[in-house]
């Protein structure tokens, strides 16, 4: 058989797979007689409303000299780590707004950062394809810098996202532009498992984000530029447990729902979607029409501790607060008083759900306190 014939057969097989996938998608839509918001409205549910005192800026964290790209809270809720274009990680006391650590990075092109469950170390990664670990309790060197305590090397592309395994300081999962996710043993610096890559059932484009289930740390979900999200079990690296096909653009961000049975995705197609990992079904689409025809991309997201609210950052600088039950925007954080002067770039909620932190291209971070909505956050 000639190369041309092989290519033709491959193209025909690919088209058949795509046709079957579309038929499956349409069949699922037929079987789902309603979505979450439709059912909620039928039960008489009303959307959350926000007044001027329901989400208030209570702290401004100033110290970076470049755009803030990423942030993360400690589980004990009183410290934040942020990564910036200025090539530094800064650890903040969220109660006093003071810096406790300022770490100069070996590579300034950082894209992601994470706090360990104990709060004793932080991790970051970026265009150097390495995930660097810093022990916050280690002594500084003669130049006043914190030395790298461990460099996790093995990716062949940029490190786009990292997250510690819950309740473990010794294991961490990264996603990369090399189309893989990796589970690392931080103690040895070695890869425990590689998800994707040479395996047939992995992503076929850059992996942009990972999120680990808090209720079952063996499960994590990844989002990729191949327009899919995939559910993985850390005990089975050879294939994804389930693949979710619903977006029409790159999946830039994924986040588990608080109960661990669902997760959300955010995409270049301008939508966020909620999926059930048990059935594989899409439960809801969150989309805000824009009259100018230019659809802003979803770049980051976070659920409130109850799951009732979804905070979503868009490429045009908007930061919408969605009522997940009724699929309705209840607030644009970028338009409220005392919001950032630049576009909001990243966001995250404290472990107890009582505070929201946003990072911005204006080099600052802001902490927002909830007023009258503690019952739904």
From Swiss-Prot:
Pfam families: WD40_Gbeta (PF25391). Keywords: Cell membrane, Endoplasmic reticulum, Membrane, Repeat, Transducer, WD repeat. Transmembrane segments: none annotated. GO terms for biological process: signal transduction. WD repeats lie at residues 63-93, 105-135, 154-185, 202-233, 246-276, 293-323, 339-369. InterPro entries: G-protein_beta_WD-40_rep, Gprotein_B, Guanine_nucleotide-bd_bsu, WD40/YVTN_repeat-like_dom_sf, WD40_repeat_CS, WD40_repeat_dom_sf, WD40_rpt. GO terms for cellular component: endoplasmic reticulum membrane; plasma membrane. Gene3D superfamilies: YVTN repeat-like/Quinoprotein amine dehydrogenase (2.130.10.10). It comes from the Eukaryota. Induction: By auxin. The keyword Nucleus does not apply. Guanine nucleotide-binding proteins (G proteins) are involved as a modulator or transducer in various transmembrane signaling systems. The beta and gamma chains are required for the GTPase activity, for replacement of GDP by GTP, and for G protein-effector interaction. PANTHER family: GUANINE NUCLEOTIDE-BINDING PROTEIN BETA G PROTEIN BETA. Belongs to the WD repeat G protein beta family. This is Guanine nucleotide-binding protein subunit beta.
